[in-house]
Amino acid sequence: GIDGMVVIGGDGSFRGAQKLADAGVNTIGLPGTIDLDIACTDYTIGFDTAVNTAMEAIDRLRETSNSHERCSVVEVMGRSAGYIALWCGIANGAEQILIPEKFDNNYDKLIEEIKNNRASGMTHQIIVNAEGIGHSYGLAKKIEEATGIETRATILGHLQRGGSPTARDRVYASVMGAYAIDCI
Protein backbone atom coordinates (compact mmCIF):
# COMPACT_ATOMS: atom_id res chain seq x y z
CA GLY A 1 0.00 0.00 0.00
CA ILE A 2 0.81 3.65 -0.06
CA ASP A 3 1.88 5.19 3.24
CA GLY A 4 1.89 8.73 1.95
CA MET A 5 2.19 10.95 -1.07
CA VAL A 6 4.59 13.84 -1.65
CA VAL A 7 3.25 16.11 -4.40
CA ILE A 8 5.58 18.64 -6.02
CA GLY A 9 3.87 21.25 -8.17
CA GLY A 10 1.68 24.28 -8.35
CA ASP A 11 -2.00 25.08 -7.95
CA GLY A 12 -3.29 22.20 -10.08
CA SER A 13 -1.07 19.65 -8.39
CA PHE A 14 -2.12 20.95 -4.99
CA ARG A 15 -5.80 20.65 -5.90
CA GLY A 16 -5.17 16.99 -6.70
CA ALA A 17 -3.18 16.55 -3.48
CA GLN A 18 -6.07 18.03 -1.51
CA LYS A 19 -8.43 15.43 -3.02
CA LEU A 20 -6.05 12.67 -1.94
CA ALA A 21 -5.85 14.14 1.56
CA ASP A 22 -9.64 14.41 1.70
CA ALA A 23 -9.77 10.69 0.80
CA GLY A 24 -7.54 9.89 3.78
CA VAL A 25 -4.16 9.61 2.04
CA ASN A 26 -1.32 11.12 4.10
CA THR A 27 -0.29 13.89 1.68
CA ILE A 28 2.15 16.79 1.70
CA GLY A 29 2.73 19.37 -1.03
CA LEU A 30 6.03 20.97 -1.98
CA PRO A 31 5.89 24.23 -3.98
CA GLY A 32 7.35 23.54 -7.40
CA THR A 33 6.59 26.02 -10.17
CA ILE A 34 8.73 28.43 -12.13
CA ASP A 35 6.03 31.09 -11.75
CA LEU A 36 6.59 31.70 -7.99
CA ASP A 37 2.84 32.23 -7.70
CA ILE A 38 1.79 29.89 -4.90
CA ALA A 39 0.11 31.66 -1.99
CA CYS A 40 1.75 31.57 1.44
CA THR A 41 5.22 30.63 0.20
CA ASP A 42 8.31 32.72 -0.44
CA TYR A 43 10.05 30.28 -2.76
CA THR A 44 9.14 27.62 -5.28
CA ILE A 45 11.40 24.91 -6.65
CA GLY A 46 12.26 25.78 -10.25
CA PHE A 47 11.98 29.56 -10.05
CA ASP A 48 15.70 30.24 -9.70
CA THR A 49 16.56 27.89 -12.55
CA ALA A 50 13.97 29.53 -14.82
CA VAL A 51 15.26 33.02 -13.99
CA ASN A 52 18.88 32.03 -14.62
CA THR A 53 18.02 30.30 -17.90
CA ALA A 54 16.07 33.34 -19.12
CA MET A 55 18.79 35.69 -17.88
CA GLU A 56 21.42 33.90 -19.96
CA ALA A 57 19.20 34.09 -23.06
CA ILE A 58 18.59 37.81 -22.49
CA ASP A 59 22.34 38.38 -22.12
CA ARG A 60 22.80 36.90 -25.60
CA LEU A 61 19.93 38.96 -27.01
CA ARG A 62 21.48 42.12 -25.61
CA GLU A 63 24.65 41.41 -27.56
CA THR A 64 22.79 41.20 -30.87
CA SER A 65 20.56 44.17 -29.98
CA ASN A 66 23.67 46.19 -29.26
CA SER A 67 25.51 45.19 -32.44
CA HIS A 68 22.45 45.88 -34.62
CA GLU A 69 21.23 48.94 -32.66
CA ARG A 70 17.75 47.52 -32.26
CA CYS A 71 15.11 47.16 -29.62
CA SER A 72 14.33 43.67 -28.34
CA VAL A 73 11.07 42.66 -26.70
CA VAL A 74 11.73 39.47 -24.73
CA GLU A 75 8.73 37.55 -23.43
CA VAL A 76 9.30 35.33 -20.41
CA MET A 77 6.96 32.85 -18.77
CA GLY A 78 5.06 33.33 -15.54
CA ARG A 79 1.39 33.10 -16.47
CA SER A 80 -0.32 35.98 -14.65
CA ALA A 81 2.62 36.55 -12.26
CA GLY A 82 5.44 38.90 -13.22
CA TYR A 83 8.18 37.52 -10.97
CA ILE A 84 10.33 35.99 -13.72
CA ALA A 85 10.09 39.18 -15.79
CA LEU A 86 10.88 41.36 -12.79
CA TRP A 87 13.89 39.35 -11.64
CA CYS A 88 15.27 38.95 -15.18
CA GLY A 89 14.67 42.58 -16.01
CA ILE A 90 16.55 43.76 -12.94
CA ALA A 91 19.35 41.21 -13.34
CA ASN A 92 19.80 42.03 -17.03
CA GLY A 93 19.49 45.80 -16.66
CA ALA A 94 16.46 45.95 -18.94
CA GLU A 95 15.37 49.39 -19.98
CA GLN A 96 11.72 48.46 -19.46
CA ILE A 97 10.04 45.64 -17.52
CA LEU A 98 6.37 44.94 -18.21
CA ILE A 99 4.56 42.90 -15.56
CA PRO A 100 0.81 42.26 -15.20
CA GLU A 101 0.79 43.52 -11.63
CA LYS A 102 1.92 47.02 -12.68
CA PHE A 103 1.60 47.64 -16.43
CA ASP A 104 -1.41 49.83 -17.21
CA ASN A 105 -1.44 49.14 -20.97
CA ASN A 106 -0.16 52.66 -21.64
CA TYR A 107 1.81 51.82 -24.78
CA ASP A 108 2.11 55.49 -25.70
CA LYS A 109 4.10 56.13 -22.51
CA LEU A 110 6.29 53.11 -23.22
CA ILE A 111 6.98 54.28 -26.78
CA GLU A 112 7.77 57.78 -25.53
CA GLU A 113 10.33 56.31 -23.10
CA ILE A 114 11.91 54.35 -25.95
CA LYS A 115 12.13 57.51 -28.09
CA ASN A 116 13.64 59.47 -25.19
CA ASN A 117 16.22 56.75 -24.57
CA ARG A 118 17.23 56.79 -28.24
CA ALA A 119 17.40 60.60 -28.25
CA SER A 120 19.71 60.50 -25.23
CA GLY A 121 22.15 58.27 -27.13
CA MET A 122 21.01 54.79 -26.14
CA THR A 123 21.60 52.64 -29.21
CA HIS A 124 19.73 49.53 -28.11
CA GLN A 125 17.07 48.55 -25.60
CA ILE A 126 15.78 45.43 -23.92
CA ILE A 127 12.15 45.23 -22.87
CA VAL A 128 11.31 42.23 -20.70
CA ASN A 129 7.65 41.39 -21.17
CA ALA A 130 5.81 39.00 -18.84
CA GLU A 131 3.71 36.24 -20.37
CA GLY A 132 0.65 37.64 -18.58
CA ILE A 133 0.87 40.74 -20.76
CA GLY A 134 1.83 38.81 -23.88
CA HIS A 135 1.38 40.06 -27.44
CA SER A 136 5.14 40.53 -27.85
CA TYR A 137 5.12 40.33 -31.65
CA GLY A 138 2.38 42.96 -31.84
CA LEU A 139 4.22 45.12 -29.32
CA ALA A 140 7.44 44.90 -31.33
CA LYS A 141 5.57 45.91 -34.49
CA LYS A 142 3.90 48.82 -32.68
CA ILE A 143 7.27 50.05 -31.34
CA GLU A 144 8.96 49.81 -34.74
CA GLU A 145 6.11 51.64 -36.50
CA ALA A 146 6.02 54.42 -33.88
CA THR A 147 9.77 54.92 -33.48
CA GLY A 148 11.41 53.73 -36.69
CA ILE A 149 13.73 51.61 -34.55
CA GLU A 150 14.17 48.04 -35.78
CA THR A 151 12.45 45.96 -33.12
CA ARG A 152 12.36 42.19 -32.71
CA ALA A 153 10.32 39.99 -30.42
CA THR A 154 11.65 36.82 -28.85
CA ILE A 155 9.41 34.50 -26.87
CA LEU A 156 11.58 32.31 -24.67
CA GLY A 157 8.71 29.96 -23.87
CA HIS A 158 9.49 26.49 -22.59
CA LEU A 159 13.23 27.07 -22.91
CA GLN A 160 12.90 28.40 -19.35
CA ARG A 161 11.69 25.03 -18.11
CA GLY A 162 14.84 23.28 -19.30
CA GLY A 163 18.45 23.35 -18.31
CA SER A 164 20.32 22.13 -15.29
CA PRO A 165 18.86 23.16 -11.94
CA THR A 166 20.75 25.90 -10.13
CA ALA A 167 22.48 25.18 -6.84
CA ARG A 168 19.74 27.09 -5.02
CA ASP A 169 16.96 24.98 -6.56
CA ARG A 170 18.89 21.77 -5.83
CA VAL A 171 19.46 22.68 -2.19
CA TYR A 172 15.89 23.87 -1.61
CA ALA A 173 14.47 20.75 -3.28
CA SER A 174 16.69 18.49 -1.16
CA VAL A 175 15.85 20.25 2.10
CA MET A 176 12.13 20.39 1.33
CA GLY A 177 12.12 16.75 0.21
CA ALA A 178 13.85 15.56 3.37
CA TYR A 179 11.44 17.56 5.51
CA ALA A 180 8.45 16.18 3.59
CA ILE A 181 9.61 12.61 4.27
CA ASP A 182 9.98 13.44 7.97
CA CYS A 183 6.44 14.84 7.97
CA ILE A 184 4.93 11.76 6.33
Stretch-by-stretch model annotation:
Residues 2:
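C-terminal binding/interaction regions
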Residues 7-9, 19, 26, 47-154:
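Accessory alpha-helical/coil subdomains and C-terminal extensions
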Residues 13-17, 35-39, 80-84:
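Short, well-ordered, mixed-charge alpha-helical segments that flank or form enzyme active sites
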Residues 14, 33-38, 104-106, 158-161:
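Short gly/pro/ser/thr-enriched loop/turn and capping motifs at secondary-structure boundaries
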Residues 30-43, 66-67:
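Acidic/polar active-site rim loop that often engages polyanionic ligands
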Residues 40-51, 163-170:
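Short beta-strand elements at the ligand-binding edges of bilobed clamshell
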Residues 135, 143-184:
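C-terminal non-catalytic interaction/assembly regions of soluble proteins
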